[in-house]
Structure formats: structure tokens, C-alpha cells
Amino acid sequence: MTTQQTVKIQLVRSPIGTKESHRATVRGLGLRKLNSVSQLQDTPEVRGMINKISYLLKVL
């Protein structure tokens, strides 16, 4: 059995004033309020979303 790798991210900047697609990406990653933390599976799709809005996030 293989264990799934996970990545933990935290929203550190507000998505107010950003593109609508960036705000949708924040919601897609399961983040709502500032400093909220989400733990997701480490997949290429999630990595791409993190890369798209990296200026709003901190990877823990």
C-alpha cells in the first residue's frame, strides 16, 4: 500500500482585488478566510493551482 503525499497550504493574503479566476482557485483549494489552512493530496493538478496563486499562499 502506498501512502498519499499531502501538501498543507495557508492563505496569507486576501484575494480581494485579484482576478476572478484566482478567487475561484482559492475556493477550489478549500480556503475561505485569511490564515485558513487546507491539507490536500500532492497531485500535479493541485501543484498547478498552488503555482497559479502562489503570491497569496504559504506552503507549510
UniProtKB/Swiss-Prot annotation:
Gene3D superfamilies: Ribosomal protein L30, ferredoxin-like fold domain
A single Gene Ontology CC term: cytosolic large ribosomal subunit
InterPro entries recorded: Ribo_uL30_ferredoxin-like_sf, Ribosomal_uL30_bac-type, Ribosomal_uL30_ferredoxin-like
Transmembrane segments: none
Pfam families listed in its UniProt record: Ribosomal_L30
GO molecular function term, any single one: structural constituent of ribosome
Quaternary context: Part of the 50S ribosomal subunit.
Name of this chain's protein: Large ribosomal subunit protein uL30
Gene symbol of the encoding locus: rpmD
Family note: Belongs to the universal ribosomal protein uL30 family.
One GO BP annotation of this record: translation
Keywords attached to this entry: Ribonucleoprotein, Ribosomal protein
SUPFAM superfamilies with a match to the protein in the record: Ribosomal protein L30p/L7e
Lineage: Bacteria, Pseudomonadati, Pseudomonadota, Betaproteobacteria, Burkholderiales
